[in-house]
Structure formats: C-alpha cells, structure tokens
C-alpha cells in the first residue's frame, strides 16, 4: 500500500483491532461484482507495497494460503484500521463496499506455486562500476548508515557528516556489517541483498535471494550471508564477497527471523506458524530443530547469548528460553503485543534491564534480565514503535506516534517530552558509537534526519529526507558490543571510575562487561 510496512510478516499484516462492517453493507456487496472491482482498488492503493501480482515488495505477499485463517469481512475491517505496528496507515476513507472488494480480491485464487532457485539467483546478480570513492572514515565506531525509505536511498554518515549516498529500490532496513566494518549488506523486501564497501565507497554486487525476504544475517567470520525468505519459504546462503549462492535450505514454515551468534558458529531462527526453534551451523549449513511450547513471532537474544526472549503473535505472554537446554525459565502475562525487535538494554544499580514498546498500546514495559522479572509499565502518551538508550544518556528515548520525543529517566522512570519538529512525526533514535550524537528521524515525505547533542539536546545538523526510518551504528547494532556498553555504567557505578576495581562481588555478566570496556581503554 502507499506507505511501506516495516518489520512485518505475512500474518502480522492483519493483526490489529477490528471494527465491524455493518451487515447491510455486507449483504449489498454479495450482489456486486467481486474480483475486477477489488483488483482495481488493490492496484490503486495496495500494489505499491504488495506488488501487482501480490507477491510482496516492502509489504508481505498476499496469497490465499497465507490468509486462509481470515474471512473477507475480518480482512476488510483490518485494512480499514491500518497497522501502526508496521507504519501502515488507516484506509478508513474507503467505504465498506470498497474495503470488502479489496479483501475478496486478496483472498482470490492465484498461481502461488512460486520458486526461486540457484539459477534464478545467479541470473539476478547486478554489478556496478561506481567510481572509487574512499570515504575517509575517521573512526569506524562512529559509522551510521541511514535508510531513506521513500527516497530509495541509503546514506553513510559519520558524526554530523554525510559521507555518501547510494540508490537501492525498496530498501527497508535490517542492515548488517562485517565485523571489520569494511562492508555492509542491505536487504530489500523484494528479495535483493546489496553489498556496499565502506572502504572504497562503492556498490559491489547485488543479488536477488528470493521473491520476498524477511531478514539477513552474517556468519561471525564474515564469509557467508544468510537470507531468510517468506516467498519461497527457504533460507539462502550467499558468498559474502561474490554474492553468488552457495546453497538453498528449504523451510517448511513462515520464518520469523534469523540471528547469528558472535560467540560460536551458529545462528538461530523461529517460525511464526510452527512451534520450532531452528539452529543453523554457519559453517556446514546443517539445520537442527527443537520443539518448543508455541510458535515465536518476535524475539531477540540477550546480550550474552544465553537466553532467547520471545512472544507469540497473540502477544499475551512473554517467554524466556534458556538456550543451554531450550527450556522456558520465565513467563509473564502481558496486556499488549511487545515489539521485541525494538527492545533496548542497559545496566543500573546492579541489574541488567531491557525495555520494549507495545503494539497499539500507549506504554513501554521495563524488565529485569537474568533475575527475570517484570519491573514497570511506563505511560508514554501514545502507541510508539521504538525505545532506545545509550550509557551516555540518563534517559530511555521513545517515540509515541506523534511529534513528541519521550524521555524516560532510567532511575525513577519519570517522563518528560521534547518536540524535535512541531506537527511532524518523530520516530526512532540511534546514537553514535560513543553516544555523543543522537540521530532522529522525522517520519514525513518532507522529513529530516536531525543530529543533536545527546546530553544537552542542542541541534547540530539537519538533512532533508523522504520518509527516513532505520539508522544503524556499527557499535549499537552489533550484539558483540553490548557487554562493552554495559561496562561503561558498571565502571561508573561500581568502580567509581577508578582502577584497580574490586570485582570479587561481581557476577559473571558484570565481569565480562567490565573487561570488555576496559579492553577498549587499552
């Protein structure tokens, strides 16, 4: 549809509160033409994101087998309400007849026996002859790519400067780095993966891994790119240098996401529609499965890679799995679906915490890690999408669907707000690696990327952008560095910023975090 869906899935497209369509309108539609009217409306309002053939672009595929659990009237009502969790707008300007015609069309039969094999992938490779353009990066830890969604561009920033921009159709986010910070890999919803050299400032090969892509990941040695696909349902392994396919692993289910471990040659993934936990050996590409309690839709790995924190799409229970034996060690009921992809982490007063926004709920929740417990529900005045923090700031930074940036004190959870741009929606904060700079997206067609001082909120730079969304700093987007960030606060709070530091009462996580931080000082 006219606004791109972000971090969505096939089933998530239709999971918000519904409003009834009156019975009279429903009966009226029964007597009217179905497919052609629906097709015309679909092409007008939906095909931009879901493709004219309904195979998905930025939005997911809309195929009968993926929508079979929903009847036409339910789908129509869900389209009417929009999906704030994916930034899809409401279509309440359409009348009940039009909404039902769209729903009927996307439920209609289509040739959905799609395939995308090794030869298709090889044939899709695109090479570029971009001019050599060394970016002269001063500090790789400050690198920050930006996704300008409707501009179909990726920016490369360092501190307050834009070093380069390159074009990529249907870019949506989920950028991954090699651990030497020499290359990034950028996926698109319609299945492409673009390699870009941060050393030479050039686009390298681009390849289409599948028709509709969920996410990408890299092996810890940087040699392999893994693309999880919704259409077809498969996992594609690409050579990270040439981008040629190595192998395709068929998946019998709708994959949620795949995340690599930095501590071992393994990646982990779940399915939205099957109670399975998949483990991929990132060297041999063998896959093993463990049966779990229920399907997992959203999840993340804790910063020390000992636990998986996840929830099913119905979103009424948060579950923590111990990855040593794949057993549940903590469960807690919730009132609204958390957006765990958008969780943030910090250390304070002897405890590790994470916070997450909740879909269509005006609050975030705060949770204690390792001594697993629910801590706090914090009202933010609207349903937000992201909450972020960094050791340099005393606040959690959250959006709430308006022009407000909500600042939540990490000590007492008191809130205050600032307005980056009056009347224009703010979304998503990212920080520079050292935390000195905060980058804000003004989520508008005539939007901006604003760079501010993290401590005093002074605006330092602003750049025009067409629907800017995700931003991906090298340090803050790599789980390997999370313990180091915890170590900054541990050094301040428990070592009083002086050495030697008595660590005799530290737990294993505190010791690792402090050691990782002290190593950077050396």
Stretches with model-predicted labels:
Residues 32, 48, 53-58, 62-111:
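Extracytoplasmic electron-transfer domains, predominantly the class I c-type cytochrome c fold
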Residues 212-223, 228-236, 240-276, 285, ...:
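Asp-box/WD-like beta-propeller blade repeats and closely related beta-sheet repeat scaffolds
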Residues 141-142, 180-182, 221-223, 263-266, ...:
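Short coil/turn segments that connect the beta-strands within blades of beta-propeller domains
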Residues 442-522:
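Blade-level signature of beta-propeller repeat domains, shared across WD40, Kelch, NHL, RCC1
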Residues 158-161, 197-201, 239-243, 281-285, ...:
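Short loop/turn segments that connect beta-strands within beta-propeller blades
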Residues 21-41, 132-133:
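Electrostatic cytochrome c docking/interface patches
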Residues 125-134, 171-177, 212-220, 253-260, ...:
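Repeated scaffold domains used in trafficking and secretory/extracellular systems
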Residues 124, 161-167, 202-207, 244-250, ...:
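A short beta-strand motif characteristic of beta-propeller blades
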């Amino acid at each position: 549809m006219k606004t791109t869906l972000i971090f969505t899935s096939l089933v998530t497209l239709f999971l918000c509160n519904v409003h009834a369509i009156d019975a009279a309108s429903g009966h009226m539609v029964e007597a009217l033409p179905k497919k052609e009217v629906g097709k015309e409306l679909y092409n007008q309002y939906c095909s931009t994101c879901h493709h004219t053939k309904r195979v998905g672009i930025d939005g997911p595929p809309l195929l009968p087998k993926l929508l079979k659990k929903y009847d036409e009237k339910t789908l129509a009502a869900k389209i009417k309400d929009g999906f704030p969790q994916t930034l899809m707008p409401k279509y309440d300007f359409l009348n009940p007849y039009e909404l039902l015609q769209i729903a009927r069309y996307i439920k209609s039969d289509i040739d959905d026996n799609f395939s995308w094999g090794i030869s298709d992938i090889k044939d899709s490779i695109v090479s570029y002859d971009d001019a050599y353009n060394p970016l002269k990066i001063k500090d790789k830890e400050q690198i920050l790519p930006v996704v300008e969604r409707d501009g179909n561009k990726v920016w490369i920033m360092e501190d307050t400067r834009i070093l380069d921009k390159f074009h990529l159709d249907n870019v949506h986010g989920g950028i991954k780095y090699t651990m030497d910070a020499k290359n990034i890999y950028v996926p698109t919803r319609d299945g492409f993966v673009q390699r870009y050299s941060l050393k030479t400032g050039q686009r390298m090969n681009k390849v289409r891994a599948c028709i509709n892509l969920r996410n990408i990941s890299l092996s810890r040695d940087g040699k392999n790119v893994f693309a999880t696909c919704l259409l077809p349902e498969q996992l594609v392994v690409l050579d990270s240098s040439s981008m040629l396919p190595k192998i395709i692993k068929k998946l019998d289910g709708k994959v949620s996401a795949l995340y690599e471990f930095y501590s071992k040659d393994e990646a982990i993934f779940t399915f939205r529609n099957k109670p399975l936990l998949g483990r991929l050996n990132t060297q041999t590409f063998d896959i093993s499965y463990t049966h779990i309690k229920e399907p997992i839709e959203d999840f993340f790995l804790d910063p020390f890679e000992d636990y998986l924190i996840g929830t099913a799409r119905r979103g009424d229970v948060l579950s923590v799995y111990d990855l040593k034996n794949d057993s549940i060690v903590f469960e807690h009921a919730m009132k609204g679906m958390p957006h765990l992809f958008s969780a943030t982490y910090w250390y304070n007063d002897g405890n590790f915490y994470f916070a997450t926004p909740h879909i269509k709920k005006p609050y975030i929740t705060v949770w204690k890690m390792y001594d697993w417990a629910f801590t706090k529900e914090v009202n933010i005045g609207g349903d937000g999408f992201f909450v972020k923090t960094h050791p340099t700031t005393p606040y959690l930074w959250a959006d709430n669907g308006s022009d407000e940036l909500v600042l939540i004190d990490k000590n007492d959870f008191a809130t205050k707000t600032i307005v980056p741009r009056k009347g224009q929606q703010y979304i998503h904060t990212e920080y520079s690696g050292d935390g000195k700079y905060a980058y804000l997206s003004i989520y508008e067609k005539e939007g901006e990327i604003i760079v501010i001082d993290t401590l005093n909120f002074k605006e330092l730079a602003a750049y025009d952008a067409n629907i800017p969304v995700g931003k991906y700093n090298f340090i803050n987007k790599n789980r390997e560095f999370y313990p180091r960030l915890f170590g900054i606060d541990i050094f301040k709070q428990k070592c009083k910023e002086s050495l030697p530091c008595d660590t005799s009462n530290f737990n294993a996580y505190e010791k690792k975090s402090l050691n990782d931080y002290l190593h950077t000082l050396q």
